Amino acid sequence: MRILLANPRGFCAGVDRAISIVERALEIYGAPIYVRHEVVHNRYVVDTLRQRGAIFIEQITEVPDGSILIFSAHGVSQAVRAEARSRDLTVFDATCPLVTKVHMEVARASRKGTEAILIGHTGHPEVEGTMGQYNNPAGGMYLVESPEDVWQLEVKNVDNLCFMTQTTLSVDDTSDVIDALRARFPAIIGPRKDDICYATTNRQEAVRSLAADADVVLVVGSKNSSNSNRLSELAQRVGKPAYLIDSAGDIQESWLQGTQTIGVTAGASAPDILVQQVIERLRLLGAEGAKELIGREENIVFEVPKELRLEVKTVE
């Protein structure tokens, strides 16, 4: 058996920034640091930060006065921001800048009274934060997940509509929903480029190439990671068995029976150490070598807030 590695895979710039914000806050201010929701959707990352003194909460009422609070990479609603401002808290925002871009699109629509339709997954924290940027009762904010949702949707004014998307969706599925929106509402206005982020798009392209050459695909990522789930689904859609795994310990030998080539990739919130552990586990099971495929180069970096840059640490 041989191992093929998707390229790119693993951490994106937004995840890297979010984790760095928590790590630097811990270095500067010391534990405990409170984080609203899991900073990124990866069990290993969250457990590691928890061991260092991060406390993950869902309600700001759980945070004591005078504490440090960090918003997760998924973003928060205007109501959550207002609640945090009303408290004696020092707040750092780890929202991915590409999610913030979508927030600004929604806020702009809200100010204009333009009805807004978000393509996204119900219950996902990014969706909750994005929907929570709209507060104009004269307009409206709607969530759709599928073309069927679009055809059932009723709006106030079909001539005053715009749409935006969650950043971690399936590129193919989203294209189908956008086609339905344009067919149902011909006057609808969308972003110049859809809001699915570069990392999501690149990793889906990479897993498509990987699946073409692999007999089975292993996706390193947690079950609550939207982008990791999309990678597994995409590999299955092109006809290859695919398994979403949190760690090397999840691998079942039965998955590898009769396989010559094992494809390995990782979601945008999965650290490389987990991929290396998967490679080691596969070698113990008889795989030889690990070849990385040629892929799209990524060199995007998002800065942490200036208060957390190491060269300006002033708190003892």
Curated annotation (Swiss-Prot):
Residues where (2E)-4-hydroxy-3-methylbut-2-enyl diphosphate binds: 41, 74, 124, 167, 225-227, 269
Organism of derivation: Sodalis glossinidius (strain morsitans)
Quaternary organization: Homodimer.
Name of the protein described by the UniProt record: 4-hydroxy-3-methylbut-2-enyl diphosphate reductase
Active site: residue positions: 126 (proton donor)
Pfam families registered for this protein in UniProt: LYTB
Pathway: Isoprenoid biosynthesis; dimethylallyl diphosphate biosynthesis; dimethylallyl diphosphate from (2E)-4-hydroxy-3-methylbutenyl diphosphate: step 1/1; Isoprenoid biosynthesis; isopentenyl diphosphate biosynthesis via DXP pathway; isopentenyl diphosphate from 1-deoxy-D-xylulose 5-phosphate: step 6/6
Disulphide-bridged cysteine pairs: none
Lineage: Bacteria, Pseudomonadati, Pseudomonadota, Gammaproteobacteria, Enterobacterales
Record-linked PANTHER family: 4-HYDROXY-3-METHYLBUT-2-ENYL DIPHOSPHATE REDUCTASE
Broadest EC class assigned to this enzyme: oxidoreductase
Sequence similarity: Belongs to the IspH family.
Molecular function as annotated in GO: 4 iron, 4 sulfur cluster binding; 4-hydroxy-3-methylbut-2-enyl diphosphate reductase activity; metal ion binding
Binding site for isopentenyl diphosphate: 41, 74, 124, 225-227, 269
Highest taxon of source: Bacteria
CDD domains, per database record: lytB_ispH (cd13944)
Residues the entry annotates as binding [4Fe-4S] cluster: 12, 96, 197
Cofactor binding note: Binds 1 [4Fe-4S] cluster per subunit.
Key words, A-Z: 4Fe-4S, Iron, Iron-sulfur, Isoprene biosynthesis, Metal-binding, Oxidoreductase
Cofactors that this protein relies on: [4Fe-4S] cluster
Reactions it catalyzes: isopentenyl diphosphate + 2 oxidized [2Fe-2S]-[ferredoxin] + H2O = (2E)-4-hydroxy-3-methylbut-2-enyl diphosphate + 2 reduced [2Fe-2S]-[ferredoxin] + 2 H(+); dimethylallyl diphosphate + 2 oxidized [2Fe-2S]-[ferredoxin] + H2O = (2E)-4-hydroxy-3-methylbut-2-enyl diphosphate + 2 reduced [2Fe-2S]-[ferredoxin] + 2 H(+)
Its biological purpose: Catalyzes the conversion of 1-hydroxy-2-methyl-2-(E)-butenyl 4-diphosphate (HMBPP) into a mixture of isopentenyl diphosphate (IPP) and dimethylallyl diphosphate (DMAPP). Acts in the terminal step of the DOXP/MEP pathway for isoprenoid precursor biosynthesis.
InterPro entries: LytB/IspH (IPR003451)
Gene Ontology biological-process annotations: dimethylallyl diphosphate biosynthetic process; isopentenyl diphosphate biosynthetic process, methylerythritol 4-phosphate pathway; terpenoid biosynthetic process
Assigned EC number: 1.17.7.4
UniProt-annotated binding residues for dimethylallyl diphosphate: 41, 74, 124, 225-227, 269
